[in-house]
Amino acid sequence: MDFTEIRLSGKTRREHDLLGEMEIPAEYYFGVQTMRAVENFHISRVRLNFFPELIRALADVKQGAAMANRDLGLLDPAIADAIIRACEELRAGKLEEQFVVDMVQGGAGTSTNMNANEVIANRALELLGHEKGEYQFCHPNNLSLIHISEPTRP
């Protein structure tokens, strides 16, 4: 994988999913599920970050979900506010280089959804004063509490 626009310090964080653990470069806002998608789907070799309008649309969906979850009492207001701020940053064009999964992938957009969830959750963690990957404070799954990936990208 070559993400030359992201400078690497050599520092990593350890993340895990149901398939096991993986070292993630500390500079990446995406996490283990995005890394697995990048490794597994080399179909078009065109990454999500070539389509900033899609990233902005995903940010709109995620922001709306965070607001609804906050209003329904499903998401802590401080976490929701950090997610909302992270989504506003995405709509302003920040962190586009972090959307690295292939535009064509298996499934129903799950990799796209998780790439967005991980980037937004990790930025929200920073806004809350935590380190990327400290998911006990804001987990990527918090961004999909009342929606699933299929409606975001068939």
Regions found by a protein language model. Name each.
Residues 1-149:
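Conserved, well-structured ligand/cofactor-binding cores
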